Amino acid sequence: MALAQRQVSCRIERSTGASTSQPVGSCLLVQRRPGQRRGVPARATPEFIDALSALVPNLPLEQIAAPCQVMKCGDIVYRSTLDPSLYNEAGFDEKTVALLAPVLAYLFLPPGVLPGAIDYYIRAPLKRKQTKAIDKNDIVLGKRLGTGGFGTVFKGELKEEGGVKTSIIIKKAKEFGEAEVWMNERMSRVAGHHVAEFVTAFDESLNVPLPAAAGKRAAPVQPTSPLDANSIWLVWVYEGDNTLSSLMERREWPYNLEPLLFGRELRAPRGPVRELVTIKEAFRQLVQAVAACHSVGIVHRDIKPANCIVSERDKKIKLIDLGAAADLRIGINYVPNEYLLDPRYAPPQQYIMSTQTPKPPPKPVAAFLSPILWTMEKPDRFDMYSCGITLLQMVFGHLRNDNALIAFNKRLQELKWDLPAWRREEEAKLPSAKGALAESLEAGFEALDADGGAGWDLLMRLLAYKPTDRPSAAAVLAHPWLTSAPGRTASLQHSLSGSFEATVSTAAAATSTALTAAGKSLGQAAKDAGLASMEEAILKVNQGALTEAQLMEELGLQEPAPVAPREGSQTIAWWQERQNELKARLVERREAMSESDPYGAAPSAMQVGSAINNARGGKGAKPTTPVKPTGPMAAAGAAAAAAAAAARVEAKVKVPNILGVKKPASGGGSNGRANGNGNGKAAPAKAANGNGSGNGNTNGNGNGAKQQLFGGLLGRKQQPVEEVQEEPEEEVEPEQETASKKERAFNLLGVFRR
């Protein structure tokens, strides 16, 4: 208790009578009890002073000092001239930059983690909302352009609001359609000018009928077989009919490519220099398109001249047919031990990455690890080999034949992909070679030897056996053969003044025939060398039947490559989500079309009723407003209608055709209380040919004003009347009758379309 009442105070005061040895300002510790006299204060020890000095700055008390000393304001006007240590500001931190630089570099390495995330989470949803929702009811199919291993291609028209028609290309994909949609949509967002312009895609389940007013513009695209129920329809803007393959088959190659790439023919004289200019530009644009795919992590896997469209609108080469492509950023359309390729253009490895590569993990993880996998496996080198074969066909005319290309691949395999050895063999054949074969070899080697042999060096690199020995697309674009001006070497200039230029021009007319003969001979030699199975596979490719089983047979594989299950794949999940969103927007578009009626006035109720009744054989028409003919001869039509109405009162009583008037195409026991045909000469009520079996309103055809009704004309001019004998109707089987009704219905719908 005494201790609790004890008060402790510390007083720091200046000693008045202290000696000079005593420090100024000492701390005196005074202990005093109540009622006790003040004693002599004891002085504090140095340890106690140090403890207080450390405690005071940490107390939650406002500091008392000059403003600038507390705020560290320094010289505000000339602050940049001060030493950073004076106002306690950190300068350039090299360590932080050294740590962040590799991270940022990694995020931008191919295939691009950060750009891919922005595209997937931001650009893709926005682009999808901006894309117009269409289905098969908006498309009119045209002629079939061809059939490939992954589907059938048609030309057609897309009819939009306002009657605007757009020429389009439609592909009905039999397999890998979802993956091709993914590739086209992604490429259209990040590098749309390097691929054919993609419009949209839909499957058979997406079918929202057009409003009644718009139903007359287009015939729905109907599936032709039960297998079409799973088909996916892909739509592109029409870019043109010319591919590199179709152009190379003509004897005018490469001069026929000049107007498509440059907008006109080059003014230089025809010869190797001019040809090399066009070939270089075409190959440069092809590699640029391939580089655009690789920059976003897409490997095409089917690079060949047939998949290089020459756009008439943009004057450049674009890639098409992305059905075999793989998006290695997140693993879309990629299975480690599955291959998709054309054996004529594929590298010897057949796979874009090792078969031991694990299956793609979830999308975020796969995207983050994609630069490591891309750097280790170099999957883009698969496409570079295909580019090398394409370049080979550009410069060597005889290799544009399938049989010759097969023989080349076989011989290159026997030589263990030693391209210089193949060249030595071909050059040894030159003295004995004749015609187009000799011209092709001479022209090809001379073009590749131009510019110091830069073209030959590039070709050897592209056709290297090891993927790591092949250059990337960016390295090819920086190669001297594409960066230097063509024809600068003395050897090529010397060839211009030689006999080669004249030989090329004189042999152009016979090139096609000679190539065909050479292809047949090489094809026979290939068969003798054991290439019959490969030739059969190539023929099936040309017929559009390249399947996994055929590739297995051609490549000599024993076990089929497993296919990813459709139900569990990321591609199918993405496709189903896309279809649900597309259908919702399509319903909104159809509702807007029905409200605004942008296609013009709908056909009249009389016309629609007549069309349906004629298709059904005159059954089930609802009463509609009658069409009254006008003109000086309209009385005959009215009288005929009245007579037919009277005939209808008596059940199934036929009025004889006393006037001998020919029945129109739209008559014959169909709609209307009457289909009376008066010729204007007889006013009596019996002058009619009415058929009261119908249950619609009057369709009296008098010689009045001109009215167009499903092709029938009610003209002012009186037509010559011929007596026609009525033939008894044949009994039709129920199935034939149903087919006949459907045929009449589609014919009538065709009138709406016109």
UniProtKB/Swiss-Prot annotation:
Low complexity compositional bias: what residue ranges? 680-690
Q: What GO cellular-component annotations does this UniProt entry give?
A: chloroplast thylakoid membrane
User: Which residues carry out catalysis?
Assistant: 302 (proton acceptor)
- Which enzyme class? transferase
Listed A to Z, the keywords are: ATP-binding, Chloroplast, Kinase, Membrane, Nucleotide-binding, Plastid, Serine/threonine-protein kinase, Thylakoid, Transferase, Transit peptide
Under the heading PROSITE patterns, the entry gives: PROTEIN_KINASE_ATP, PROTEIN_KINASE_DOM, PROTEIN_KINASE_ST
Q: Which domain of life is it from?
A: Eukaryota
Q: Where in the cell is it found?
A: Plastid, Chloroplast thylakoid membrane
Q: Where is the composition biased (Acidic residues)?
A: 723-736
Q: Using the UniProt entry, state which stretch of residues is the transit peptide.
A: 1-41
Q: Which residues bind ATP?
A: 145-153, 172
Annotated SUPFAM superfamilies:
Protein kinase-like (PK-like) (SSF56112)
UniProt xrefs under PANTHER family: SERINE/THREONINE-PROTEIN KINASE STN8, CHLOROPLASTIC-RELATED (PTHR46699), SERINE_THREONINE-PROTEIN KINASE STN7, CHLOROPLASTIC (PTHR46699:SF4)
Q: What does this protein do?
A: Serine/threonine protein kinase required for state transition by phosphorylating light-harvesting complex II outer antennae (LCHII). State transition plays a central role in response to environmental changes and allows to adjust to changing light conditions via the redistribution of light excitation energy between photosystem II (PSII) and photosystem I (PSI).
For this entry, the protein name equals: Serine/threonine-protein kinase stt7, chloroplastic
The organism encoding this protein is Chlamydomonas reinhardtii (Chlamydomonas smithii)
Q: What is the lineage of its organism?
A: Eukaryota, Viridiplantae, Chlorophyta, core chlorophytes, Chlorophyceae
